[in-house]
């Protein structure tokens, strides 16, 4: 579960390394899960890239440490909290996605991120 002030690693090559959640988008929502869109600020970035430190960005959560139950009865959790930076059209700003992503992204119409990911769990 991601809430305000949570730090996430960035799982793409947009230039940001770490972001901090400042708002979970949705009507009065407190927690974000896999597939939810958040507003975040860039805390650590690589120089000369598309995203700079202290930029305000939108991102979609692709991995969480919290256990996630699926309809089939399986449960899944990842080793880190990670997100992919997106633009207003829900397309990723980077051209590569690092690490596995959850299958729930396909159901939430983030098919571009799913196609760029090396592994879908």
Swiss-Prot record:
The keyword Signal does not apply. Keywords: Ribonucleoprotein, Ribosomal protein, RNA-binding, rRNA-binding. One of its GO terms (molecular function) is structural constituent of ribosome. The keyword rRNA-binding applies. GO terms for biological process: translation. InterPro entries: Ribosomal_uL14 (IPR000218), Ribosomal_uL14_bac-type (IPR005745), Ribosomal_uL14_sf (IPR036853). GO terms for cellular component: cytosolic large ribosomal subunit. Pfam families: Ribosomal_L14 (PF00238). Belongs to the universal ribosomal protein uL14 family. Binds to 23S rRNA. Forms part of two intersubunit bridges in the 70S ribosome. NCBIfam families: rplN_bact (TIGR01067). Part of the 50S ribosomal subunit. Forms a cluster with proteins L3 and L19. In the 70S ribosome, L14 and L19 interact and together make contacts with the 16S rRNA in bridges B5 and B8. This is Large ribosomal subunit protein uL14. It comes from Synechococcus sp. (strain CC9311).
């Amino acid at each position: 579960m991601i809430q305000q002030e949570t730090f996430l690693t960035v799982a793409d090559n947009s230039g940001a390394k770490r972001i901090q959640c400042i708002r979970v988008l949705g009507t009065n929502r407190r927690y974000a899960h896999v597939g939810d869109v958040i507003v975040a600020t860039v805390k650590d970035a690589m120089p000369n890239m598309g995203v700079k430190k202290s930029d305000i960005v939108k991102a979609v959560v692709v991995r969480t440490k919290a256990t996630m139950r699926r309809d089939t009865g399986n449960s899944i959790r990842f080793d880190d909290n990670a997100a992919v930076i997106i633009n207003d059209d829900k397309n990723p700003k980077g051209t590569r996605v690092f690490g596995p992503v959850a299958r729930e992204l396909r159901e939430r119409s983030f098919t571009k991120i799913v196609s760029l990911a090396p592994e879908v769990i």
